[in-house]
UniProtKB/Swiss-Prot annotation:
Pathway per the UniProt entry: Membrane lipid metabolism; glycerophospholipid metabolism
Active site residues of this protein: 195
Residues that hold sn-glycerol 3-phosphate according to the record: 108, 140, 142, 195, 248, 258-260
Species, as recorded: Mesoplasma florum (strain ATCC 33453 / NBRC 100688 / NCTC 11704 / L1)
Alphabetical list of PANTHER family matching this protein: GLYCEROL-3-PHOSPHATE DEHYDROGENASE, GLYCEROL-3-PHOSPHATE DEHYDROGENASE [NAD(+)] 2, CHLOROPLASTIC
Pfam families: NAD_Gly3P_dh_C, NAD_Gly3P_dh_N
Gene designation per UniProt: gpsA
Keyword Plastid: no
UniProt superkingdom: Bacteria
GO MF term set: glycerol-3-phosphate dehydrogenase [NAD(P)+] activity; NAD binding
Primary localisation category: cytoplasm
Matches recorded under PROSITE patterns: NAD_G3PDH
Annotated InterPro entries: 6-PGluconate_DH-like_C_sf, 6PGD_dom2, G3P_DH_NAD-dep, G3P_DH_NAD-dep_C, G3P_DH_NAD-dep_N, NAD(P)-bd_dom_sf
Keyword Lipid metabolism: yes
Protein name: Glycerol-3-phosphate dehydrogenase [NAD(P)+]
Amino acid sequence: MSKKNITIIGTGAYGTALANVLADNDNNVIMYGIVEQQVDDINIYHQNSVFFDNKKINKTIRATNSMAAALENTDILILGVPTAAIKHVVNDIIKYAKKPMDIINTAKGLDEENLGLLSDKIKKYFEGSNVISTYSALYGPSIAIEVVDRQPTAIMIASETIEKAKELCNVFSNEYFYMYPTTDIAGCEISAALKNAIAIGGGILKAYNAGDNAHATLLTLGLNEMYEFGKHFGAKLETFLNFAGLGDLILTASSKKSRNFRLGERIVELNDAKKALESFNLTVEGVETARIAHEIGVKYQISMNFFEIIYNILYNNVKPISLLNNVFRDVKLV
């Protein structure tokens, strides 16, 4: 397959990991960042030490703090910024883009304003411009440092057509990074968002030394409620049983590398979610997701007993022990 000109918006850990994969596949990769020190770190020292210390990345990766330069001849554009920054970034992309591009989103979350899918909101941001050729979303169990270390990883790419998804698989996939194609954007997106809230519950159970049986119960109930939620948006069951669903859930809800999991542990340590959040300096996506998912569930009358417990712990001053006391109650499986 011919080389692609690929732009990654953001110089975060995951964007850097994807840049390394794509550069390993002989694509032309440029990253756009706003922190000059990071841009220099990538260009001069071939590393992103903010996230990966002195670990080297592919020497062909370039970085710039000029959006115009980043979009000079882009075929594929990857949105590697947090959900809250997307609207501002899209405005700049529309301003400087030279041609229509395949847009791939990696941000996780739900649409708070419209109580819907993030993908619908992002596509709406691009409306009226000639910038977006196709829209895709990339999700799955892929801790950034392991991808940079070229450890075996498998994720999913969801596109509007299976042909486009397969084409993008060929761009990304190699001997250590496998990408599976699907058209279920809704299923991938919902899985990526909701598993973060479930991971908070995983950390809570771990901190109480609840054992593997309870943890397996949590994963089972969480996965079922993810699917119940997803059905409302037309998501497919098979997606929740694949890398973006079950795979990412197992990883995020079981690993101390997950910020959401660590927050759950911290909540138990302080016995107070508000105090835990105040002491936690990192962005934890599952907190906002739990609130928005709750609002969507109420609006559309989606039964989500497990998510209600997480929501009440985070927002209604319910003590974390309530998860342990209630996780086995009102069990409803697909």
